[in-house]
Swiss-Prot record:
Belongs to the ABC transporter superfamily. Phosphate importer (TC 3.A.1.7) family. Pfam families: ABC_tran. This is Phosphate import ATP-binding protein PstB. It comes from Bifidobacterium longum (strain NCC 2705). GO terms for biological process: phosphate ion transmembrane transport. Residues 2-248 form the ABC transporter domain. The gene is pstB.
Length: 259
């Protein structure tokens, strides 16, 4: 089952530069939460702090708390690698490992975490993860073919299978459909709706229609001016956000008057 995330007074820095300030948000388990907002407002930056992925950038650091079921992911005794096992990430562009087969792509995260599996267990895990990503029937007869040979939409679902194979509690998705055609986009959206019964899902999207279709809750990020830190402007259930937002800036953004 998915787990709850609570972000309390989060400030995100790159060196001395304050990129995002004072984010407070409660992300419900087994729901889809969408992050929307204009370019540069910090939504992807906040997303990457939820699994400490931003730390690959030298000088990046966080003030405040990011709690997963009450445990602060930034406590000194917390291993970032362990965080990324519990919180999976699917990136903007499909990124299957180009030298690996479909099968090996699914198992890559498991083996990276030094888990040795018997062949029968590995086969079962590959089938389970690919079924979970709605890809099994399309690839079951060519598991040893290169993952890079799949279509764009299939590659993205393969990346989702790779993410779920390590049994995370949360799935983060950074514009997962931006490089896909409309048919592949709908396939991924259908998959997201199915996955939320097992995972907490947070998705960054520039597509307002997509957020309205798939999200249970929506967070609108904004920035006051170029060079100023981004911030969480407004958070609401998605029906309220798109039909009756109680925030003028959110209403202007959703209606296309800026952004």
């Amino acid at each position: 089952m998915g787990q709850r995330i609570d972000v309390n007074h989060e400030n995100i820095y790159y060196g001395d530069f304050l990129a995002v300030e004072d984010v407070n948000i409660n992300i419900e388990p087994n729901k889809v939460t969408a992050f929307i907002g204009p370019s540069g407002c910090g939504k992807s930056t906040v997303l990457r702090t939820l699994d400490r992925m931003h730390e690959i950038i030298p000088g990046a650091h966080v003030e405040g708390e990011v709690l997963l079921e009450g445990k602060n992911l930034y406590d000194k005794d917390v291993d970032p690698v362990a965080v990324r096992r519990d919180v999976g990430m699917v990136f903007q562009r499909p990124n299957p490992f180009p030298t690996m087969s479909i099968r090996e792509n699914v198992l890559a995260g498991v083996r990276l975490n030094n888990h040795h599996l018997a062949k029968s267990d590995a086969d079962d895990l590959v089938e389970w993860a690919l079924r979970g990503a709605n890809l099994w029937e399309e690839v079951k007869d060519r598991l040893d073919n290169p993952g890079i040979g799949l279509s764009g939409g299939q590659q993205q679902r393969l990346c989702i299978a790779r993410a779920v194979a390590v049994h995370p509690q949360v799935l983060l998705m950074d514009e997962p459909c931006s490089a896909l055609d409309p048919i592949s986009t709908l396939a991924v959206e259908d998959l997201i709706n199915e996955l939320k019964s097992d995972y907490t899902i947070v998705i960054v999207t520039h597509n307002m229609q997509q957020a309205a279709r798939i999200a249970d809750y929506t967070a609108f990020f904004n920035l006051k001016a170029v060079g100023q830190p981004g911030h969480l402007e407004y958070f609401a259930d998605t029906i309220t956000m798109f039909n009756n937002p109680q925030n003028e800036e959110a209403e202007r953004y959703i209606s296309g008057r800026f952004g």
